[in-house]
Amino acid sequence: RKAQANGVPGVRLIGSNELREIEPNCIGLGALHSPKTAIVSYGQIAARIADEIRERGGRICLDSPVGRLLEQGGEVRVELADGEVFDTVFDQAIACAGLQSDRLAERSGDQDTPRIVPFFGQYYVIDEAFKSHVKGLIYPVPDPRFPFLGVHFTKRIDGQMTIGPNAFISFGRENYDGRSMNLADIFNFASYPGFWKFAARNLPATLRELKTVVSEASFVREAARYVPTLASVGIVPAVRGIRAQAMEANGALVDDFVIRQHGNITHIRNAPSPGATSSLAIAEYIVREVMRR
């Protein structure tokens, strides 16, 4: 119903026989088929956007972490983390700070919730000899008892087939290699009452995800539940992402966009999946809303 309400073309429910015609190695009682579903290369998109910004006279300031955004008299200034104030004044500012969105928003005068709790997700690439077993993208039916979607299959732009991600608490908002931890980030979620309320409600899901973190065999078994021919597939680690999961003080996960206006400053407090894939459409919406003021 949501797909139809949003005008997604061609989406329909199919039975097990048609499922096997579309994905011969996939088992299930039925499926929701979306023939126009697409994937993108986030890296290529980001690189092209950067090129366009520079072509239009814009600047991309690397190694310049933002401390807070200050508004006075209808003008917005950017104060860097070291206290230096950026030399340009803006009439509008849109903050898309991802994993740091709650901190930047609070320092800039917005409220402190929802808070970002980081969850990492590991992807694996399956053995080249098995990638033909899946033709497109296959997702499990979400279990409403658990907060995350589960392991799914994604065919990348380069033709490689990935499975993943799992979902487990990250011991650092920028801990992409999985070999370090940030004590300030750990204290930030461990001292948040909402985190413990969430954890208490989701112990079964936590144990299930922990198995996929410590055991690649468990990870493969999750995927093989609906593509049994991959039960013995070999996998190698691919990318590891960190999800900026917004969480309310009562432990509820925020599953929709949270866009807050604070004067002439707009904070994107939550942008759930598929935020990256849909980033251009989301950007158009945000800019359109800001320009209406």
Task: List where the protein language model places each region.
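C-terminal catalytic lobe of FAD-dependent flavoproteins
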Residues: 198-293
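Flavin-binding catalytic cores
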Residues: 110-113, 130-131, 156-240
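A short, glycine/Asx- and small/polar-enriched loop/turn
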Residues: 22-29, 70-77, 247-253
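Helical element adjacent to the flavin cofactor pocket in flavoenzyme catalytic cores
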Residues: 32-92, 96, 278-291
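Dinucleotide-binding Rossmann-like beta1-alpha1 core, especially the glycine-rich loop
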Residues: 1-18, 22, 28, 150-151, ...
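A general structural signal for well-ordered alpha-helical segments in protein cores
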Residues: 16, 46, 101, 219-220
